[in-house]
Amino acid sequence: MRLGVNVDHVATVRQARRTFEPSPVCAALIAQQAGADQITLHLREDRRHIQDRDLELIKELVNIPVNLEMAPTEEMREIALRVRPDRITLVPERREEITTEGGLDVVSMKERLKEYLKPLKEAGIEISLFIEPDKEQIEASRDVGADAIEIHTGRYQPLERHRFEEAREELRRIREAAIYARERGLRVYAGHGLTYHNVKEFVRELKDVVEELNIGHSIVANAVIFGFERAVKEMI
């Protein structure tokens, strides 16, 4: 199973002070050196963390695939066509949300997305849609021309609250959805809310049907804690 490392929250720390550090570009290069298979970043409309220049530099400097998460807006499509990431993942976006709260409703946007995606497909960019593990959404994703889906795994988090039955049921839902999507010619990825605490069981149960995980916040959080001693010693 491949790992896509999301560097958004390196930029979140930087933007808290509107300064130049820490750099998500440096983080992307370190992730690549550490063995990541892909760099994922979300250029939001409000630019709350990743900035346009981050995307441009990461695409220019890393030698592994770049996955651009973006809302289905005209502005973002223009940026994607200019920068040419290896993949775009369409996600829903609300300015008031802290993070992406759920999957894209492809069913209700079906006709619009068919037209929206045409130039991106013609440019040779892989198209992935971030959706719930739902058969209707999978069918719609195939119909609009997606190459892949990324299943929203946020509801798998009850494992961390010791609600094991709920977590097992969510794994079952994700497995069924992944199999259904693969049978219809879609590649299957997954992400959101995966941590060091719950990812091992996820991989063990789904490695035969899910090709790739995209993980960011948990990696950044661990880096802050486990790199803190070294950083303090270097300052002293």
From Swiss-Prot:
It catalyses: 3-amino-2-oxopropyl phosphate + 1-deoxy-D-xylulose 5-phosphate = pyridoxine 5'-phosphate + phosphate + 2 H2O + H(+). GO terms for molecular function: pyridoxine 5'-phosphate synthase activity. One of its GO terms (cellular component) is cytosol. InterPro entries: Aldolase_TIM (IPR013785), PyrdxlP_synth_PdxJ (IPR004569), Pyridoxine-5'_phos_synth (IPR036130). GO terms for biological process: pyridoxine biosynthetic process. 3-amino-2-oxopropyl phosphate binds at N6, R17, G193, G216, H217. It is found in: Cytoplasm. The keyword Metal-binding does not apply. Its main location: cytoplasm. Pathway: Cofactor biosynthesis; pyridoxine 5'-phosphate biosynthesis; pyridoxine 5'-phosphate from D-erythrose 4-phosphate: step 5/5. Catalyzes the complicated ring closure reaction between the two acyclic compounds 1-deoxy-D-xylulose-5-phosphate (DXP) and 3-amino-2-oxopropyl phosphate (1-amino-acetone-3-phosphate or AAP) to form pyridoxine 5'-phosphate (PNP) and inorganic phosphate. Belongs to the PNP synthase family. This is Pyridoxine 5'-phosphate synthase. The gene is pdxJ.
